[in-house]
């Protein structure tokens, strides 16, 4: 331990033991405990207690809980556990009966402060820290602590109850350690005392009539099989699987969700022989006994298993498909997917749930659609995948939601009334519909998909969220439609669809709802990014009013919409699709957009549009946009001037990224779009051209990055440091580095560095020649600064000495004015 910390420790222990002192808040105590953990990892806990008697005095004082505050009680219980984690220190503490006085049945559980959850939680955590060696196991078995943990499983505090269950699993695993590798696992009756006690308690709880007790037992088993992958878990399952199986004989089945979690946890175990232990039969029985809404998560979990019999996979997949099969049967004359609706009890139960109430119907359909959507993206996705039937079901659900379905039965009519206008189901169906775009579908169904999407996008009844989902699904079907994988062009059917879509998109761009305008702009941006270079798409877009409306939204009153409009305008301009009159004014219109974006960057009151402008400008610079190439120096200078005054740190970071792109093009590998590298050889020269260094001195780039080194926002300073390191590596010769004072303009260099060191980084550097700029780059310890910036912002104040000093400094502060120094 640090000598200064040793000097401060007695005073701090005295303060903690004094209930009249309102010491620190919980955060400081947590940091103090973390520090003690670090110390005990490097030193002997026993030696630490012997060298610092004040610690033993504090811990002994806790045996009089009426004289200690609850938060200090909780801290002390955990601290004792940290010390007792080392076996020699455990025995030392046990001799003085400190451990029994704190963790025994007559200890903390008998205190008045035991009613406070944080004290109970501290007691559990203290036990968890010390339970790391055989001596601790004997103590736990003899002290009554395990019995207290059993009662805490039902604690009203969920955190305490969960911690108690986790600790029981930890104790069980610790008890079973120590067997010789390869030796046979003894029967459960021959297990250590602690292990037997826990297993017997779990067994009794599984036979209990009260559901909470059953749930507690199942949770312990689930955690055990999830964490412990040793052979003894097979003996444990052999012992407890019969009472688990008998839970299915009850009506209703208790703790269904906990029971499903257990079965899946056991099924993932790498050490069990599933065929021998009857797990597959138990899973099959469970799938058939549960209601459709209960069986869905278990069916999905079963299908995710690596080694699962095909028969069980088929059963689980059938459970997931059944609700959609019922939808198809209720709305069409076709029987739906073969073999899924055969008059079984399961299918009748599904129909009953779909028709029982709106909440039950909506819940089952949303769960089913989400599970199937997740399943399609997994490697364990069933094959063959019933693409056609699932697509028909998704479209049918959307028809039911918009009221256009033509039911063939009374059940279908009731479904129309239940699902009509249901936004939640519409959203789930559109998500699933988008996922189905990855499969191969017949042309007539693809055309129906486009028709349903058009209707949804056009309907005045569609909510903003439904429209957003419809735009996303539309994009996915356009990106991956029924075409050859090598083709990136839009199909003729997709182009016809776009011809009908653009008038609808025009209306949505004029929507009074800002969320709709925003979604429409995002959709347009994606469209242009993917197909802006295709002639047919360009013609269809130009023949609409969409580009004009998108540019008008640069003046939208909502900042999110302005930001999306900036992105759309940037894409339109990059592809030469911006709205403009005939050719004479085309160049002026293009320049007009550039100035509009510059105006937004300089004057917009919200950060989102300004950030969007910087992203567009960075892309334009990287891609060699015509307006940027026309006068790159003016462009970069104007942008950086505006960015240097911006109060938004994300704008400043993006400005530094733009500067990095500029330097990379000019100093890095030559680029086709870089005006400074035209005609240069492919290999980079060891020193940049003097004219470019003069350009750098004229630009505010170096000054902007130099001042940003001490930006109050760390990401900005880090980005600036990286930029200057890149600039130095590309410009300063590797050999014969010169000091700042060797520069021809050493006075100005020293003055600039002095101002920077004194914190006047906002002051302009003044006129610098290239040699002065290079001298500053040589003089700065950029690597050291980069290392300091990589540390957390409180790395100086996080020292243990600072922590102890601050905790002592807070003594006497009123509780309502407590301050966390960290």
Swiss-Prot record:
Main localisation: nucleus
Transmembrane segments: none
UniProt entry keywords in alphabetical sequence: Cytoplasm, DNA damage, Metal-binding, Nucleus, Phosphoprotein, Repeat, Ubl conjugation, Zinc
One GO process term, biological-process aspect: positive regulation of cell growth
Transcription found in the keyword field: no
Stretches for region Required for interaction with NDFIP1: 100-200
Cellular localization per UniProt: Nucleus; Cytoplasm
Motif, BRAT1-like motif: chain positions: 820-822
Repeat positions for HEAT: 495-531, 544-576
A molecular function GO annotation: ribonuclease inhibitor activity
The protein's role, per its UniProt record: Component of a multiprotein complex required for the assembly of the RNA endonuclease module of the integrator complex. Associates with INTS9 and INTS11 in the cytoplasm and blocks the active site of INTS11 to inhibit the endonuclease activity of INTS11 before formation of the full integrator complex. Following dissociation of WDR73 of the complex, BRAT1 facilitates the nuclear import of the INTS9-INTS11 heterodimer. In the nucleus, INTS4 is integrated to the INTS9-INTS11 heterodimer and BRAT1 is released from the mature RNA endonuclease module by inositol hexakisphosphate (InsP6).
Protein family membership: Belongs to the BRAT1 family.
Domain comment (free text): The BRAT1-like motif mediates inhibition of the endonuclease activity of INTS11 by forming hyrogen bond and hydrophobic interactions with the active site of INTS11: Cys-821 coordinates one of the two active site zinc ions of INTS11.
This protein's name: Integrator complex assembly factor BRAT1
Organism ancestry: Eukaryota, Metazoa, Chordata, Craniata, Vertebrata
